[in-house]
C-alpha cells in the first residue's frame, strides 16, 4: 500500500486505491489535495468569528467579510471597486475612562503578504482614513486606521475642550493602542503574526509616526514620516504669529489676489540660482528675496504690496520670535506661496479668519490650551504664551525627542520627507529635527537608520509645481519599485539592508491623471545632498542630475 505522508500541517488520508502503475493514483490525489490547500483561504478562523475575540479594554463591534469591490465608505458614497475581498473588523478601545478610540482592521481574504501597515491621520483627525486602507489592502497588507478617539472633521478641535484624556488619545495613545490591537486581530485571523510592520503617514500623521519611533520603538520595523507636525505647540504658535501679522489691524492683510505676484517675484529673484529655470526654488535657503522690492509706487494693485503688507510678509518669512529675539519656530520659506495648496489655502486664506492656519492654530489654543471659546488670538503674548502652551500640551502632542537609540537598537528604519514648497508646516522644521537627531546620536549611528528627503516644489504632503509623486502617503500613483517609490525604498532598507541613496520623483502632466504621462522627473537626494544639473541634456529628465553636498 502506498501512503501519502503529511503536507505542511495537513495530513492527507491513506491512499488505499492502486492504479495499474502502482502509486500514480496516489500521486494524483496528492496533487489535487495540494491544489486545494494552496488555493484555500489563508486564514485560521472565519472572519465573522472574530466578533467574539477578547482583547484588553476593547470591544469588537463588528467582524464581517467584504466582497471584492463591495466596500462603500459612506451610505451615499461610491464603492471602492478595485479593493479585493477582505475581513473588516471594527472595534472600540477604552484605555481611560473618557476614551472612546475607534479602529478598523482590514485583512485580505487571500494574498496576504505577511505584513502589517498602520496608517495615521491629518489635521485634528476624527475619522478613519478609508482611502489609504483601501490602497494598503489592495497591495496585500493587513492594515489599520483610527479616528484617534473622537469624531469630527480634521479642522475641528472642539472635542478637546474639557477632555484632557482625549487629547492624550489624539496625541499618542490611540495610534499605539491601534497598533497593539491590530496585531492581535491579525494573529487571530491568520494564525500568524505579521513578519514586518510599517507605519506611513503625513502632516499630523507624520507627527504620529515620529511619536511611534520615539515612545513605542517596538511597534514598527519601518516608519515613513511625511511633513511631520512634530513640534506641535510651537508650530501652532507660529500660526498665531502669522495671524497677528496679517490681521492684527488688518492693514497688513494680504488678499489672495496678490499671491501670484508674490510668487512671480520670488521666482524672478531665485528660480535660476540652481542653474535651471523651471519654476521651482530648489533650496529656499539660498533665496534672499526682499518683499520691499514689491512696494507700490503709486496707489495699490494686485501686483504690488503696501508697506504694512510688505512688513507682514517679512514677519511670516522670519517666523515667530519673543521680545528677546529668540526663535520660537522656523518661519515659512519662499517658493510655496501660489497654487491650490499654497498660501490662499493655508496662510492668507480667502479672507481674514478663513485660512486653515486660523482653524488649526486658533482651534488648538481655544480648546487645548486656554480652554476658552471666547479667547482672541490677538491677545497672545509670545513671551509668556509659549510656556503656557508647552506646559499644557507638549507632553501629549510634541514628538521632538532626538534620542532614537531604542528604535535603532531594534533594527528600525526611519525615513522623513518634506516638500520645500510646504505652506502648512515649515520644511525647515524637518531639517531641524533631523539635525538634532544627528547631533544627539552621532552621524555614523544616525546614518544607519535615518534618512531625510527634501522635495523641491512639492507643497504639503503632495501637489505643487515640482515633482511630487514618489510613493508617499496619500499619493499611490507612483511606480512601486524602490527607485521611484519611497515606501518601497523603506521596505527594501528594512528587509534587505539596502539604504536609499536616491528617489526619483515625478511631476505628471496632470497630477490627477498619470496616464497622461510625465512632465518632469527629478532625483530626491538624502539630506544634506541636493540635486544638481550636470549641465547638459533635458532638464526634465532625472538622469541629467546628480546628488551633491548641500547645506546642512
Question: Predicted segment positions?
Answer:
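Cap/lid segment of the alpha/beta-hydrolase catalytic domain
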Residues: 113, 123-191, 237-238, 376-386, ...
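Short beta-strand/loop motif that positions the catalytic acidic residue
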Residues: 416-418
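Catalytic-loop region of hydrolases
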Residues: 43-115, 130-131, 276-277, 281, ...
